[in-house]
Each structure stands twice: as structure tokens, then as C-alpha cells.
């Protein structure tokens, strides 16, 4: 199985082109092996590119634990560049089918520098759409208990669930303790991604992400979008915000409540390889 290793701000993926080669029957099991950083290639996710009847191509993502998230913002940027460079598409504006619906990345050319701006779609704010247990309505500044602490959380779905926490002031040990506790909190029947946010200014935030099924990750595109939406909903940030993640910076824009969120950032190829294990 031939693959390409790529990353978006350090969030790394094994990209497999399913247009010209056969793929395994159990991609979740393959992801557990391929993503292992000691015994496999090592990655935050396995990404399969497949034909689509509804879009230019279809993307499936599998976490290191074998689970399949609905979407991945960093992976979609990698996929857009891969598809154009490998001749799967000739245009700079793509449509990609995902479990979260159609996602529309656009490759922006500035000399020899390529970045990707992605129409991530409208955020989903109703509790049932997150999904999150409890009474109907948006979840903004709601208290959740985890361990011996209480957190004020805002829940946003960008096709996958996010629990955004502002001002928790956690050290690394606290991040690694409360991130997984909130991920599996009973309020979230499908588990959740967790973002801990420090507001630096109305146009800039610093974020650490505990990714569902992954753990600490250097970057999360859907998480950055969820943070920007939560910042607007709670009056903490502007509609155009630079999100500083451990792996780098994403520009997130949410022009109006009724419209989509836009994410802009880089993606990089690392190497090509061949998986020879049965």
C-alpha cells in the first residue's frame, strides 16, 4: 500500500490514494497499526481518498484508536493539496465529501507558497446537534463537573463535537488530567474534542486541544473553528481571529451568525512510502 505522509501544523496524517490501489476491508484496524509511532509509520490519523458521486472526491479519516471522526480540518487541507499535486483534480476550488457533509477547500497561490482556505460550513449550536445530553437550545457558558473541578463550557459542532473552555488556567498536568475527563463526560454521548483557550486579545487566542480518540495534538482545524465561534458567542473575540496552537497559527473567520466558518492555513508533504505489512 503506497502512502504519503503529510501534516498541517504538526497534526500528521498517512494519506492513502484509493483511486489507483485496493484498500483494506478494515481501515480502523489498519489505522491502529499504521498510526503507531513505534511499530508503524506514526501519525495522528489515517486518511483514505476515495471516488465520490457527490463531490470531487471522498475523504475518510481514522484515528489511532481506529475510530472514524466525522471531519478533520487539518486533514482536509492536506487532502486539497495532495489531490491537486497528484492530478486527482485540476482546479483550485474543490468539493470533498465527508461524514460531516460537503467541505469546500480552496488552494491559494502566492508565488511558490500554497495555503488552503476552507469553507467549513455553518457551525451547529443546538444541543442535539453537538450531540450533548440535556434540555434543548445552545450550550453557552454551561457548568460541567470533571473530577474535583467545575468548568464553564461552550459546545459547538463543526461536523464533530467540541467542548470549548475559556480561562481554565491549567498547567500541563491539569491539561492531561481534565482533557480526557471532559472527552468522555457523560454529557457527550459520542465523546468530544476539548479546547482549553486563553484569550490574548479580541483577535488572537492561544489554544491547547485534547482530541477525541487521539489525545494532545499540535493542531486541530475544526477545534480552531469551534473556538472562534465560541469566542463570538461569549463576547470574548472578534469574528476574525488568529488561533495559536502548539503547531502554529490558523486564521479563522466567521463573518456572520447565519454563514459558514472559514479556516486558512498551510499543509506540507513530508515523504512518500510503502506499507508492506500484511
UniProtKB/Swiss-Prot annotation:
SUPFAM superfamilies named in the record: Diaminopimelate epimerase-like (SSF54506)
Subcellular location as annotated: Cytoplasm
EC number: 5.1.1.7
Enzyme superclass (EC): isomerase
GO CC annotations, alphabetized: cytosol
Site (Could be important to modulate the pK values of the two catalytic cysteine residues): 162, 211
Keyword Cytoplasm annotated: yes
Pathway in which this enzyme or protein is active: Amino-acid biosynthesis; L-lysine biosynthesis via DAP pathway; DL-2,6-diaminopimelate from LL-2,6-diaminopimelate: step 1/1
GO BP term, example: lysine biosynthetic process via diaminopimelate
Superkingdom, taxonomy of origin: Bacteria
Binding site for substrate: 11, 63, 73-74, 160, 193, 211-212, 221-222
Signal peptide: none
Record keywords: Amino-acid biosynthesis, Cytoplasm, Isomerase, Lysine biosynthesis
InterPro entries given in the database record: DAP_epimerase_AS, DAP_epimerase_DapF
Active site: 72, 220
A GO term, aspect molecular function: diaminopimelate epimerase activity
Catalytic activity: (2S,6S)-2,6-diaminopimelate = meso-2,6-diaminopimelate
Assembly behavior: Homodimer.
Known role: Catalyzes the stereoinversion of LL-2,6-diaminopimelate (L,L-DAP) to meso-diaminopimelate (meso-DAP), a precursor of L-lysine and an essential component of the bacterial peptidoglycan.
Database matches in NCBIfam families: DapF (TIGR00652)
Entry's family note: Belongs to the diaminopimelate epimerase family.
UniProt-recorded name of the protein: Diaminopimelate epimerase
Protein source organism: Desulforudis audaxviator (strain MP104C)
Taxonomic path: Bacteria, Bacillati, Bacillota, Clostridia, Thermoanaerobacterales
Designated gene of the protein: dapF
Amino acid at each position: 500500500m503506497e502512502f504519503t505522509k503529510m501534516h498541517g501544523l504538526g497534526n500528521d496524517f498517512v494519506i492513502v490514494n484509493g483511486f489507483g490501489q485496493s484498500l483494506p476491508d478494515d481501515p480502523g484496524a489498519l489505522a491502529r497499526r499504521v498510526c503507531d509511532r513505534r511499530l508503524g509509520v506514526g501519525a495522528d490519523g489515517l486518511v483514505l481518498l476515495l471516488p465520490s458521486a457527490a463531490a470531487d472526491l471522498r475523504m475518510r479519516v481514522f484515528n489511532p484508536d481506529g475510530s472514524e471522526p466525522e471531519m478533520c480540518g487539518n486533514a482536509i487541507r492536506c487532502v486539497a493539496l495532495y489531490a491537486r499535486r497528484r492530478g486527482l483534480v485540476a482546479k483550485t476550488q474543490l468539493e470533498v465529501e465527508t461524514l460531516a457533509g460537503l467541505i469546500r477547500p480552496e488552494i491559494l497561490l502566492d508565488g511558490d507558497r500554497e495555503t488552503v482556505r476552507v469553507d467549513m460550513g455553518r457551525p451547529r449550536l443546538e444541543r442535539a446537534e453537538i450531540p450533548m445530553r440535556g434540555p434543548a437550545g445552545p450550550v453557552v457558558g454551561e457548568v460541567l463537573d470533571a473530577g474535583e473541578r467545575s468548568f464553564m463550557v461552550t459546545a459547538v459542532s463543526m461536523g464533530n463535537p467540541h467542548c470549548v473552555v475559556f480561562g481554565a488556567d491549567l498547567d500541563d498536568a491539569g491539561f492531561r488530567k481534565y482533557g480526557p475527563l471532559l472527552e468522555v463526560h457523560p454529557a457527550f454521548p459520542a465523546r468530544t474534542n476539548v479546547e482549553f483557550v486563553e484569550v490574548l486579545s479580541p483577535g488572537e487566542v492561544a489554544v491547547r486541544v485534547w482530541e477525541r480518540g487521539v489525545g494532545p495534538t499540535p493542531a486541530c482545524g475544526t477545534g480552531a473553528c469551534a473556538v472562534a465561534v465560541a469566542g463570538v458567542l461569549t463576547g470574548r473575540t472578534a469574528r476574525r481571529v488568529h488561533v495559536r496552537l502548539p503547531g502554529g497559527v490558523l486564521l479563522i473567520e466567521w463573518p456572520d451568525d447565519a454563514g459558514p466558518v472559514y479556516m486558512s492555513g498551510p499543509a506540507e508533504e513530508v515523504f512518500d512510502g510503502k506499507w508492506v505489512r500484511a
